[in-house]
UniProtKB/Swiss-Prot annotation:
Assembly, per entry: The Tol-Pal system is composed of five core proteins: the inner membrane proteins TolA, TolQ and TolR, the periplasmic protein TolB and the outer membrane protein Pal. They form a network linking the inner and outer membranes and the peptidoglycan layer.
Keyword annotations from UniProtKB, A to Z: Cell cycle, Cell division, Periplasm, Signal
Subcellular location per the Swiss-Prot or TrEMBL entry: Periplasm
Matches recorded under PANTHER family: PROTEIN TOLB (PTHR36842:SF1), PROTEIN TOLB HOMOLOG (PTHR36842)
Signal peptide range in chain numbering: 1-35
Chief localisation class: periplasm
GO BP terms: cell division; protein import
Keyword Lyase annotated: no
Family according to the record: Belongs to the TolB family.
Organism: Desulfotalea psychrophila (strain LSv54 / DSM 12343)
UniProt cross-references to InterPro entries, sorted A to Z: 6-blade_b-propeller_TolB-like, PD40, Tol-Pal_TolB, TolB_N
Name of protein: Tol-Pal system protein TolB
Any one of the GO CC terms: periplasmic space
């Protein structure tokens, strides 16, 4: 028979079981919760504290004893590559004299990178581990062996794996940055790593080269050159440096393509019929379709990650503004209304966010917007210099842009929340028009 007394007894028993279950879950999860406190789901939120990492000097496990310069150089490269991601704070080695036996918890470290190296004739072996300080547990271990010229790429691979262990997203230490360098009245395209350690000259036209663009897989790079007397579009196979071919040699403009996600076609600006319009061409340069046919200028297309939309710049309203086009229907709508001019859009590879430059109070500043949202654009830069040519990092967390201080152009980076703005390279001459690929 069900009575009020039995009901109360059942309720009490249920509450007790629920309480015991909660205690059990909490007891088993305390260690996990402590570790979870250091894994930040929104790693670019303004209020998120940076992950504190110690990178002591590497130890020598081979013959010849400790080689201080090598030990310090390897650790320094690891530290700089991790810090570049904008979510890592490196504890200075001066606080623990670079020793691997330091009390990491006392130093306030969340993690420590512990490594060793061994020299071979013309080769080096690296053993690198990532220690979770709170758990006193190695959460990542990697071993690499290669030529001395492969030392930095091996370090970058570890850093990418370490960032993935901490955030769930692969790092960008192994990514490549292409840019235009201006020196001695010529512009050519160069390519380098995130730290500017290894530089490769991609073009040698001894003329003006503009608008480098990676294909989505990063294996090819297209650019426009004036070396033949007029602007032509070329593409080079980065895996085979000498393989370069003409992609479009049409009369007039052949400019700034955006490559489709499948890499089989690109959209660029051609002026073969007079006005600069957007066309889609295949890998052989054949025109597949014309996308715009209105008076005015239509330039700077950028593909969405799914390949269904583009954002581009048009002055059809009187001044340059951003427009969104659905490629299947060709439906187009204006996106920007604030700012005297809005130009150079670049679509994030991981989300619906457009980075672009906007002319405000006489200066170009970097903004971002969601093309499918009514939310207002977000301003990232505000200092009294000129900011142009924004481009997203492969992980969608950072933006490179060109800053002009009235004397020279330099490449800067900033997190997508507007934090950690800094100059990226210290090369001679001027650098601009950066592009980023894995």
């Amino acid at each position: 028979m069900i009575t009020m007394k039995n009901i109360l007894k059942l309720r009490a028993t249920g509450l007790l079981l629920l309480l015991l279950l909660m205690i059990s879950v909490l007891g088993n999860g305390i260690g996990q919760a402590m570790a979870a406190d250091r894994v930040y789901l929104d790693i670019t939120a303004p209020e998120t504290r940076k992950i504190k990492v110690a990178v002591p000097w590497f130890t020598n496990t081979g013959e010849g004893g400790m080689k201080a310069r090598i030990a310090k150089d390897i650790a320094d490269t690891v530290a700089k590559a991790l810090k570049f991601h904008g979510i890592i704070s490196i504890i200075p080695t001066s606080e623990y004299k670079g020793r691997q036996t330091a009390d990491w918890a006392k130093l306030g470290a969340d993690y420590a990178v512990l490594g060793s190296y061994k020299m071979f004739p013309k080769k080096i072996k690296l053993e690198i581990r990532l220690l979770d300080v709170a758990e006193n547990n190695i959460i990542l271990g990697k071993s690499y062996k290669g030529s001395m010229s492969q030392q930095n790429p091996m370090i970058f691979k570890f850093c990418d794996a370490a960032i993935k262990s901490l955030t769930g997203t692969e790092g960008i230490a192994s990514s490549r940055i292409a840019f235009v360098s201006y020196e001695k009245r010529t512009k050519d395209v160069f390519m380098t790593d995130i730290l500017g350690r290894r530089i490769r000259q991609v073009t040698r036209h001894n003329n003006l080269v503009v608008s480098p663009r990676f294909t989505r897989d990063g294996n090819f790079l297209s650019y426009s050159s004036y070396h033949s007397g007029s602007q032509k579009l070329y593409i080079t196979d980065l895996r085979q440096a000498k393989i370069t071919k003409s992609l479009s040699r049409r009369k007039g403009m052949n400019l700034a393509p955006t490559w489709a996600p499948d890499g089989k076609s690109c959209i660029l600006t051609l002026s073969k019929y007079g006005a600069p319009d957007l066309f889609r061409i295949n890998q052989q340069g054949k025109i597949l379709e014309q996308l715009t046919s209105r008076a005015g200028v239509n330039v700077s297309p950028t593909y969405s990650a799914d390949g269904r939309h583009i954002v581009f710049v048009s002055d059809r309203s009187g001044r340059p503004q951003l427009y969104l086009m659905e490629l299947e229907t060709k439906q187009t709508k204006r996106l920007t209304y604030d700012g005297r001019e809005n130009a150079e859009p670049n679509w994030s590879p991981v989300e619906n966010k457009i980075a672009y430059s906007s002319l405000r109070d006489g200066l170009y500043q970097i903004f971002t917007l969601d093309p499918f949202s009514a939310a207002p654009p977000k301003q990232l830069t505000s200092d009294l210099t000129r900011h142009e040519s924004p481009v997203w990092s492969p992980d969608g967390n950072q933006i490179l842009f060109t800053q002009y201080d009235g004397r020279r152009q330099q490449i800067y980076a900033i997190m997508k929340n507007g934090s950690y703005q800094r100059r990226v390279f210290s090369f001679p001459g001027s650098q601009s028009s950066a592009r980023w690929a894995r």
